[in-house]
Each structure stands twice: as C-alpha cells, then as structure tokens.
Amino acid sequence: MSFSDLARQTQFIDGVGQADLVASGKVSALELLDAAIERTTELNPPINAINITWFEHAREIAKKFKSNSKQKFGGVPFILKDLGAPYAGQHMSNGNIALKNAKYIAPVNSLLVQRFIDAGLIIFGRSNSPEFGSVPVTEPLAWGPTRNPWDLSKSSGGSSGGSAAAVAAGIVPMAHASDGGGSIRIPAACCGLIGLKTSQGRISLAPFGDEANFSVHFAVTRTVRDAAALLDEVHGPGVGDRVIAPTPTRPFKSEVGADPGKLRIGFIDHHLAGEKIDNECVQAVRDTCKLLESLGHSVENSWPSALDDKQASGKFTAMWSTNMSVGINALSLMLGRETTKDDVELMNWTMAEYAKSKTATDYAQAVYASMIYRRTMQQWWADGFDLLVTPTTAQLPLPIGTICNMPDDPLAALRIAGNWIPLTPPFNTSGQPAINVPLQWTKEGIPVGIQIVAAYGREDLLIRVASQLETAQPWAHRTPNL
C-alpha cells in the first residue's frame, strides 16, 4: 500500500498530537486533511467504514483555516457518525435506504456538531451506522457491512462501527460516536479503542435529542488524553436541556495522569443470564483486576444487585419499541411523505409495529420501571464502591452476518444481540458513565474489551484510572495490518 510520507507518518498520531503539528506550523490543516483523504481512499474499501464524503467542502474549510489557541483540535480531520448528527448542508441517511436514495440534506447543525467545528475539527465525511442504530453491529442494507480492521471476516461492532473501524485503521485519530445501549463501548471493544460513554446529560443533544432518553453522543479515540481533551471542548448543557450532569471541578484533561488514589473496585466475569461467555472475555476481566490490584486498588467479587434482574430488559420493551415508532414518524417528516414498509429494514419496522400494541399506560410503567432500576443500580456506588469492571462483550467480535434481518423471525437479531452484549445497556438505563479500555488481546491479536463503570457524573475518575492503566499496560503500539 503506497502512502505519501505525511499520510504514513500521521496515521497513528492521536488528535492532540495532530493538533500540535498544525499549531507548530509543521503541517497545514490542508496537508493534514489531504493525508486523511489519502488514507480514506486506500484503506476504506476493504473495511467500508466511511459511507459519505465531502472532500472538496472540507478542503475549502482547511484552506481558510487559521489556528488559534482557543481551538484545541485546530486542523484535525474528523468524521461524523451517519446517525443523529445533522451537519447543515450535508447528506445524512441514519443508515436508512430511503434517506440515502432521497439524498436527504441536514438543514442545521446539532449543538454537538457545532462544538466539534468550534474546536477546530475539519469534518470531511460520515461513518457507516446500522439503520437507526438499533443493533450492535454495522451492517445496514443501505450501505453494506463495515468490517473489523483486525479481522475482515468479523464485525467492527455497532452502532458506531464505522467510526471505530476508521479510527482503528488510522484513517482519522478520533471520530464522533453515539451510545444508546453500548454503541460507543461495543465497537471500541471490537476495534481496540477508548470508548467513553458519558453520563446522561453531560453533552447536550440539542436541538432535537432528549437527554432524558438512554442515548448519549461523544466519540471513539485511540488515547485517553484525546477523550479527555475532546470532552473538555464539547461538554455542557444547551438551552432547555432536561437533564444536566454535575459540572466538573476542573478540566477533564487535568485528570490524565492524575493519581486516582486507592479505589474500591468490584467486578463481574460471568454472563448474568447464564449464557455462554468466551474464555478470553473472562480472562480479560481477571487479568485487568490483577493489574488494578498491582496498582494499589482493592478489588472484590461484587456487583450491583440490579444486574441480577433477568427481567429488566423486558420491562423497557415499551420504551424501545415506542422510540422506534417515533423515529419512523420522524422519517416521514424527513422524506416529506408517509413512510412505507419498503422504506425500513424489517426488524425495525416490526419493532415499530409492536409499539402499536402498547398503551400509554404501558409506556408510563416502563418509564417508572427505568427510574426504579436507575436508583437500584446507582445504590451500589453510593454504598461505597468506586468502580465496576466487566467484560464489554460476552464474546469476541462476531462474524459478519451473525446479526441480520431474518424474515422468519424479525426480532431474532435483538435476542442474539442481547446475549452478546448483556452488560452495556444497563448503564444507559442508569445514566452512568462507562468506558471501554483496550487492555487485553487474544493470542491471535484480536482486541478484548474491558468496561469500567463509575458513579453518575464521575467521568473524571474514569479518565484517571484509564490513564493509569494506559501507562501501566500501553496499547498505542498495537495497530492492524490492513
């Protein structure tokens, strides 16, 4: 594979490092962008991470770019997930075939996208996403599957699988991602990245999203310092936000390298529903716990009692299905016509149809159940624990096609997904911050994700501990051979 010197030299430099190159005058924003475009052209075809590009639009922005001290990521190339991140004047499909064919153009920037721009990021495209982000793999009928850079026969995870694959391949140093049930942490686990799901209300979802829902938006990164520095640039409420996370006491970047002190940490290394969990995932948790103990922390075989509730996911079905129904109604507005069954993938259409059997009372009861679950979950931290360590996924990255539309059983994909990722959705319901840390790898060189969960509002503690682990057992030298 023939790269220019700059494209090769900057391939695995993180966002902070690339911004430093621009600020120092060693490279221009346009040169850095062209290097990323070159890598996109060479590396994207086998992995299908980036599905929409606007290279010339980005080049015009890069040509006019003038670095200043307020833009912490000035001139750094960046991509948006093709889901729920409107960028004024640019195409967005949400992984949906009808929006793709209609060439839907976003009318405004979301507040987060505007904050990315204000931070100096040069946005040149979108990353692949499953339709409406409804499954933890990235294989939409509209755009085809995104493949894992570490093993092209495997999934990159989802729903932010395109972003994770692009960062893992070194196309960009970090990329926008979102998480409604694990969709930042799961692809980060599959692709060997940092994936920080922030606290509910940490980052505004204005003007269209609802912070009181399960989903959050942020990014996947290669390094802890990128996650911390980017969070400094984009966190905070917007006008009218219903949920606002506690204000940090100092910049998140200050937590990188800070001593976390001696922490009380619980762990879980089995599947709560009694399903299969890969030996590599179990061993990854145990090895991580040993590492944490060697760093001076107290580790106990303990976890929140809420995780033992095997009926929990069923209690929230009315919410999930109703949210899908609302999403399909929104699709009609975006298309300017009524949505038909042919416009939507079968699983999502079936879920929305299921919502019609639910009443307002069913929905209200699900909201109430989620509130009780949230309080029960958070009580474990209130009782004296600082962190929880779990496998991010119960199995290694799945083969492409494992989770797909099945005409004879449209909702089978959700059951398969639930068995694969039992320990990420609970912390969307509880609203707590959680991070995937790429500490462990199989003998074959496949990443094995570790999830660390903190109390609500404690991203600072996650950053301290993740930074401590990154120093103790570095992963930056690990890169896929594409």
Predicted regions and their residues:
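A short helix-breaking turn/cap at a secondary-structure junction
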Residues: 1, 194-289, 472-482
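A short acidic, glycine-rich active-site loop
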Residues: 98-106, 151-154, 409-421
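Short glycine/serine-rich loop segments
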Residues: 106-238, 428-449
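Short helix-loop capping/hinge segments that flank enzyme active sites or metal/cofactor-binding pockets
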Residues: 3-7, 73-98, 257-269, 318-378, ...
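Short, surface-exposed loop/helix-turn segments at secondary-structure junctions
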Residues: 244, 314, 365, 384, ...
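Acyltransferase
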Residues: 26-34, 110, 251-254, 277-304, ...
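Acidic/His- and Gly-rich active-site-bordering loop/insert found
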Residues: 58-60, 68-141
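An N-terminal boundary/leader segment
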Residues: 1-63, 294-296, 356, 478-482
